[in-house]
């Protein structure tokens, strides 16, 4: 994180080019499986505002799209390999999925999903209208209500 400066991050230029290309919306990853947040979440320190970039990149992105009249899309993964309660043993894409030392003992999935819901609520309330939200990832027995999917989806109607 100490080298992440986002010096080439230019959502205003991207938005202008997207509009010129005839695009109607753009989707940016707010958080991917590694758990690093491009927004200023109050629920983790693993975020862009704790890097040399030092600013909320999602906020800049949302503002740039709106200036160009484009719809705002956010990609947000359900997985967070960085969170201590995320159950990575059995996740078929986690880099340490087959290592017994990364077992799920002492992991509290309800605590993890509360963290997940809190971050989704931040995305859906801190940036105004989000036109598209793409919740990524389910696998094997980790589908739908195992994640409590209706709760984060309900936040999309708050704005």
PLM ranges: what are they?
Residues 1-158:
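Mature catalytic domains of secreted/periplasmic carbohydrate-active enzymes
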């Amino acid at each position: 994180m100490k080298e992440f400066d986002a010096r080439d991050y230019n959502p205003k230029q991207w938005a202008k080019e997207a509009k010129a290309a005839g695009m109607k919306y753009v989707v940016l990853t707010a958080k991917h499986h590694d758990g690093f947040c491009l927004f200023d979440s109050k629920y983790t320190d693993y975020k862009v505002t704790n890097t040399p970039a030092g600013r909320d990149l999602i906020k800049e992105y949302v503002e740039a799209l709106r200036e160009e009249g484009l719809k705002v899309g956010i990609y947000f993964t359900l997985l967070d390999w960085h969170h201590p309660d995320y159950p990575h043993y059995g996740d078929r894409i986690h880099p340490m999925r087959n290592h017994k030392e990364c077992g799920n003992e002492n992991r509290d999935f309800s605590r993890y999903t509360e963290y997940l819901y809190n971050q989704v609520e931040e995305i859906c309330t801190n940036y105004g209208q989000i036109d598209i939200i793409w919740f990524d990832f389910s696998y094997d027995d980790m589908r739908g209500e195992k994640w409590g999917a209706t709760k984060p989806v309900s936040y999309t109607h708050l704005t």
